[in-house]
């Protein structure tokens, strides 16, 4: 203890003079025994006595949530449990304008590896009720270390508060269950990325790591409430090689708690353990997700273009229609509707020196690139004012790739060729994403495509995680995410979309922190096509911003009860809640359908910045049944919209309780398509229930705007 005090007091004392009061109302203070990070909404305090760090207070939403000082984190290193009070020595706490950086050194013992450091940066933004904590483990020494489990953040609060855990998975190609909700009353440890604790007021924890058995949320008998990772629960990811229920491509560790997997911290390297969000809320349980998404969408999620896109995969796929001559009429039709980005899916690349892995234009499909590496089709799109999007499988290559022939050492060994032998897969082999030379090459490919072809959006597909020699697939995942972030830094105005139609890629929050997610290829498992699209949005909202979900617009849906212009009025409002992407031959739309679609696109482009960041879920039933209503409320501070959808069943009129309204203000509610005003309501009336009428197989978009001052 004396040695620990000798180490921590000098740096903490020096930091006392470095306290910063930001003009934007975030305050970070540090002295010899305490650290505080707060704003006008929320505050968190830590004790630093003796080099041990404990969270002593979490104040917000009208109360104090910490019931006893508690460890800030737990981490199992080489089989030895450690916490912020055991096994580590605090080196320093450094205040920033909106943050505190805690630096720890692993305490020296006979068995502990030397030179291990843990850095935890806690960020609080102006007006936010959410603390964002990012943990990085650094090995400055000569020996590796194994990390089998850890918490990303934790606090001790009332042990008997009601709790709700939510676990997410992608994989719409094989399954429909993307969100799993578990209500808990006592101690528990569940798979999950979201944990809400409390009733009308409470706290929440969210993990930015992807879904999987290793992602954990829980609470012990003392009230220690946490979000973290337990790698020992995970065994293997089959990727596209296994798609059968109930486990699909997951293989949990059958020997747990005996570990099969752990993260390996290599000498002179670091591991990004992940980011967690701890926040407080009040005003009802629905306000928890609203508080999170306001912070996440405003600061973490990149400000990519929420453009209206078309993607060529449906209906042309890999066929002859995927060509310059066939697609020019689609460009003209898209331009007339107001579509902004034209994305060429798989098969724009090809030919000698152009296959997947080489990433050059197929001269048979898109001629003209022989001279300047830019096909005539790209010039034609520029002339029409259309942006270009390109599909890529950045981590996989065709066996005919000349790049692979020149650099076979870039392939993932020993499993790099396995998927190429699978008749159910795309016949692609796998690069080693952790290879620095390959990383530089792929970054160069993206640089070239942006420079030569003005690519505005990439869709990255086939991101199976694999073990490569001495790197496991968690290393592989982190290497890929790191590459995409480097691409974003180089090209901040380019959108990077990840395909999440297979499970265990990056969904939900790791993917959303990068950009939109292509979520659904239209594979049905007993439901109608429209019901599945509604279900996709229902599964994401309210915690995952639905604007990040990419779905096929008019993909076999403008038929039957959704035919004609009325079908457009029922379907395009759903597209506006998502990353709107047409999957259809636009030249087949009738004149009435084209006119109605163009009206909605123009309205969306004029108002899309008003959708959110919070999106409340107004109906509880899963619309996958094809009968239930589904309704959402995008809300941007004091105003927003109601999107209501009715399928085959349900009443003609439903009462939808709105959230986020000021009960003492007056609001005008209007139909955005007709311009008709439904009425003027007090906020208290809207909170009690707004009556909304929708015909069967129909939709309605209502504007909710405040009138005058409060």
Specify the residue positions occupied by each region the protein language model found.
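Glycan-recognition surfaces
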Residues: 405-440, 444, 482-588
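Aromatic-lined carbohydrate-binding/catalytic grooves of carbohydrate-active enzymes
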Residues: 41, 306-444, 451-460, 466
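Polysaccharide-binding surfaces and accessory modules of carbohydrate-active proteins
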Residues: 20-38, 42, 54-238, 666, ...
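Secretory targeting and sorting signals
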Residues: 1-17
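C-terminal beta-strand-rich structural cap/linker in extracellular carbohydrate-active enzymes
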Residues: 679-710
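Short Pro-Gly-centered flexible turn/kink motifs
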Residues: 263-282, 642, 696-705
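Conserved, mostly hydrophobic/aromatic
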Residues: 41, 135, 268, 381, ...
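Carbohydrate-binding surface patches
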Residues: 41, 213-217, 622-663, 701-703
């Amino acid at each position: 203890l004396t040695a620990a005090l000798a180490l921590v007091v000098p740096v903490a004392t020096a930091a006392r003079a470095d306290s910063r009061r930001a003009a934007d109302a975030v305050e970070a203070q540090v002295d010899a025994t305490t650290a505080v990070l707060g704003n006008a909404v929320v505050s968190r305090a830590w004790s630093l006595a003796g080099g041990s760090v404990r969270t002593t207070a979490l104040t917000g939403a009208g109360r104090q949530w910490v019931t006893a000082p508690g460890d800030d984190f737990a981490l199992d290193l080489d089989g030895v449990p450690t916490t912020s009070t055991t096994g580590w020595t605090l080196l320093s706490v450094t205040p920033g304008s909106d943050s505190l950086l805690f630096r720890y050194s692993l305490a020296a013992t006979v068995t502990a590896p030397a030179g291990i450091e843990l850095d935890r940066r806690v960020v609080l933004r102006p007006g936010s009720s959410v603390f964002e904590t990012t943990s990085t483990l650094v090995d400055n020494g000569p020996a590796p270390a194994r990390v089998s489990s850890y918490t990303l953040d934790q606090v001790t609060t009332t042990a008997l508060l009601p709790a709700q855990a939510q676990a997410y998975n992608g994989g719409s190609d094989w399954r429909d269950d993307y969100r799993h909700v578990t209500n808990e009353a006592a101690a528990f440890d569940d798979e999950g990325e979201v944990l809400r604790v409390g009733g009308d007021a409470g706290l929440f924890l969210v993990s930015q790591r992807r879904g999987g058995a290793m992602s954990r949320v829980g609470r012990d008998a003392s009230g220690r409430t946490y979000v973290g990772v337990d790698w020992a629960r995970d065994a293997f990811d089959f990727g596209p090689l296994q798609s059968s229920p109930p486990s699909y491509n997951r293989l949990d560790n059958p020997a747990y708690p005996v570990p099969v997997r752990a993260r390996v911290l290599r000498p002179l390297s670091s591991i990004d353990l992940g980011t967690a969000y701890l926040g407080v809320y009040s005003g009802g349980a629905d306000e928890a997700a609203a508080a999170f998404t306001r912070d996440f969408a405003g600061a973490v999620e990149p400000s990519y273009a929420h453009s209206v896109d078309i993607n060529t995969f449906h209906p042309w796929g890999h066929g002859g229609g995927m060509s310059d001559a066939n697609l020019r009429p689609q460009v003209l039709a898209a331009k007339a509707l107001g579509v902004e980005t034209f994305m060429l899916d798989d098969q724009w690349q090809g030919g000698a020196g152009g296959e997947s892995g080489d990433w050059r234009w197929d001269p048979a499909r898109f001629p003209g690139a022989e001279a300047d590496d830019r096909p005539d089709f790209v010039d034609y799109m520029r002339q029409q004012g259309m942006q270009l999007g390109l599909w890529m499988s950045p981590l996989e290559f065709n066996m005919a790739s000349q790049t692979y022939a020149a650099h076979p050492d870039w392939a993932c060994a020993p499993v790099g060729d396995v998927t190429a032998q699978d008749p159910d897969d795309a016949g692609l082999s796998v690069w080693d994403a952790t290879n620095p030379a390959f990383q530089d090459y792929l970054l160069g490919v993206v640089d070239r495509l942006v420079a030569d072809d003005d690519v505005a959006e990439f869709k990255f597909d086939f991101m199976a995680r694999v073990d490569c020699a001495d790197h496991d697939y968690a290393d592989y995942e982190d290497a890929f995410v790191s590459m995409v972030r480097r691409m974003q830094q180089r090209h901040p105005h380019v959108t990077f979309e990840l395909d999440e139609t297979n499970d265990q890629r990056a969904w939900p929050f790791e993917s959303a922190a990068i950009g939109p997610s292509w979520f659904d290829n239209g594979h049905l498992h007993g439901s109608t096509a429209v019901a599945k699209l509604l279900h996709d949005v229902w599964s994401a909202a309210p915690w995952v911003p639905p604007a990040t979900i990419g779905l096929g617009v008019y993909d076999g849906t403008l038929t039957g009860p959704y035919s004609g212009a009325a079908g457009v009025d029922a379907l395009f409002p759903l597209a506006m809640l998502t990353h709107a992407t047409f999957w259809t031959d636009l030249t087949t739309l009738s004149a009435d359908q084209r006119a109605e679609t163009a009206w909605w696109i123009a309205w969306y482009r004029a108002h899309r910045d008003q959708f959110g960041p919070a999106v409340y879920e107004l109906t509880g039933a899963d619309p996958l049944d094809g009968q239930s209503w589904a309704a959402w409320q995008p809300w941007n501070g004091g105003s927003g919209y109601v999107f209501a959808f009715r399928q085959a069943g349900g009443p003609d009129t439903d009462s939808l309780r709105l959230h986020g309204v000021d009960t003492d203000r007056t609001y005008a509610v209007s139909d955005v398509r007709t311009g008709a005003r439904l009425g003027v309501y007090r906020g208290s009336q809207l909170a009690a229930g707004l009556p909304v009428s929708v015909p069967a197989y129909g939709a309605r978009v209502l504007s909710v705007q405040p009138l005058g001052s409060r």
